[in-house]
């Protein structure tokens, strides 16, 4: 028999404070019945003596201190999961919002999950093909990796996310029926939601997609649980159904802003730029749920997207994210201004696990050499551009002029590709050789003579 409590101490924003509670646990879910008979959900976020602080998942409008009844369920937030979640859409606490009814299963799953034992982790290998040359060739996404995309306000990260969801497929000989995408949207606008849904329906990928949606006008408390519900679903599909899951979460910045707002409501001591001191560990509790496990066939790969405030890569959100994840894909406003899509700035971008998931048996034997040469050559192009701004392009040496041509071709043909352009890894590497062949053979010092003999298409 559950005990019910009447009379609240205080209502402050999304928080409710209750006194004289007994046997209550942290993170426990509560049911709140207000005077008009409406029932809301909340969770315990703080315990001090006999006082409990509760976050309400919906608005606290209409709650009075005298006529509100609270009962504790004795359980954390749990969601029902089965393979039937594929093709469905849910809100941030795992409730179906697509009008097709609830998911029924014999077992419910705690959205907080649990970290994978390091001893049980399997080293990530095998790449996931996104169909985007700048990612597949230069910052390869490896199965089981966590690789964030650093973007900025007004940049085409929504289009990039939609394109990856439409085009992504696994390599290594596993069937496509074992691959699915879990998409978590946090604090997005209504028109962004309609954009995603329209693109997914047009591409026919709904049947291998699970959506968790928290809109900008939805409760911020729900924004905190959205990625956790999505990752719990991914863990179920990966480790109980044996599927390979790509989790795309956007926008992590909105999640962190919600965390800061709730921390402020709880009157916690702020850290850098007002964010709570536990921001690092909180983000780690999300990112570290990616990976592969020994004895399990499935995998979870994360591609979180965050918008850097003022394009500042040293801001706490991208800064702390970079410490936890295994690289980053950085979008450039300068490239976007040149109408290059996707505007991936390859020089600060990095995939730390790329080296172990490419090459013969994974992609192609020349992949690593081509990638290294493109990085080196494009880096030198930036030096040549800086020099040309001082002395003028006409005064450059003949070799430097060739590098300028290489840089223009690299940006316009390799980095730039249409929203509907889906390139295989072989097409990407062949295109890379075509552009590298603009340079003299003597300048291609990052590739082996055998690779040059086989793939070089220039005259020298």
Swiss-Prot record:
It comes from the Bacteria. One of its GO terms (biological process) is proton motive force-driven plasma membrane ATP synthesis. GO terms for molecular function: ATP binding; proton-transporting ATP synthase activity, rotational mechanism; proton-transporting ATPase activity, rotational mechanism. Transmembrane segments: none annotated. Keywords: ATP synthesis, Hydrogen ion transport, Ion transport, Transport. The keyword GTP-binding does not apply. InterPro entries: ATP-synt_VA_C (IPR055190), ATPase_a/bsu_AS (IPR020003), ATPase_F1/V1/A1_a/bsu_N (IPR004100), ATPase_F1/V1/A1_a/bsu_nucl-bd (IPR000194), P-loop_NTPase (IPR027417), V-ATPase_su_B/beta (IPR022879). The keyword Transport applies. Belongs to the ATPase alpha/beta chains family. PANTHER family: V-TYPE PROTON ATPASE SUBUNIT B. Produces ATP from ADP in the presence of a proton gradient across the membrane. The V-type beta chain is a regulatory subunit. This is V-type ATP synthase beta chain 2.
């Amino acid at each position: 028999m559950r005990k019910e409590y009447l009379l609240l101490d205080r209502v402050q924003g999304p928080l409710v404070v209750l006194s004289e509670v007994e046997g209550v646990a942290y993170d426990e879910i509560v049911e709140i019945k207000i005077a008009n008979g409406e029932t809301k959900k909340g969770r315990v976020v703080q315990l001090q003596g006999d006082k409990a602080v509760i976050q309400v998942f919906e608005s606290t409008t209409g709650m009075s201190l005298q006529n509100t009844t609270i009962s504790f369920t004795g359980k954390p937030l749990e969601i029902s999961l089965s393979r039937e979640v594929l093709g469905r859409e849910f809100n941030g606490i795992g409730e179906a919002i697509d009008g097709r009814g609830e998911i029924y299963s014999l077992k419910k799953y705690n959205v907080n999950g649990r970290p994978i034992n390091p001893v049980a982790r399997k080293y990530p290998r095998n790449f996931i093909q996104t169909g985007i040359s700048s990612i597949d060739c230069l910052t390869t996404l490896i199965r089981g990796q966590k690789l964030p995309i650093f973007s900025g306000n007004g940049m085409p990260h929504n289009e990039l996310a939609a394109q990856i969801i439409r085009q992504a497929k696994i390599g290594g000989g596993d069937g496509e029926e074992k691959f699915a995408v879990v998409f978590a949207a946090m604090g997005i606008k209504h028109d962004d939601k309609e954009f995603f849904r329209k693109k997914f329906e047009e591409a026919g990928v709904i049947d291998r997609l699970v959506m968790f949606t928290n809109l900008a006008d939805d409760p911020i408390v729900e924004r905190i649980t959205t990625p956790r519900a999505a990752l719990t679903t991914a863990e179920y599909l990966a480790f109980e159904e044996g599927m390979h899951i790509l989790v795309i979460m956007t926008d992590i910045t909105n999640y962190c802003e919600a965390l800061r707002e709730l921390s402020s409501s709880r009157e916690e001591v702020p850290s850098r730029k007002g964010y709570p001191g536990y921001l690092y560990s909180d983000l780690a509790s999300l990112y570290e749920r990616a990976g592969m496990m020994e004895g399990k066939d499935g995998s979870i790969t994360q591609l979180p997207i965050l918008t850097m405030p003022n394009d500042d890569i040293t801001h706490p959100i991208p800064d702390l994210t970079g410490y936890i994840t295994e690289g980053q894909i950085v979008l450039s406003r300068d490239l976007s201004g040149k109408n290059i899509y996707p505007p991936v700035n390859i020089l600060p971008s990095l995939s730390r696990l790329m080296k172990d998931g490419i090459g013969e048996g994974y992609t192609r034997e020349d992949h690593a050499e081509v990638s290294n040469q493109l990085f080196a050559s494009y880096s030198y192009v930036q030096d040549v551009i800086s020099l040309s701004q001082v002395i003028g392009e006409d005064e450059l040496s003949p070799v430097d002029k060739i590098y300028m041509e290489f840089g223009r071709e690299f940006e316009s043909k390799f980095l730039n590709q249409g929203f509907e352009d889906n390139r295989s890894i072989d097409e990407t590497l062949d295109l890379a050789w075509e552009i590298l062949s603009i340079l003299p053979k003597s300048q291609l010092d990052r590739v082996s003579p055998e690779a040059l003999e086989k793939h070089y298409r220039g005259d020298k």
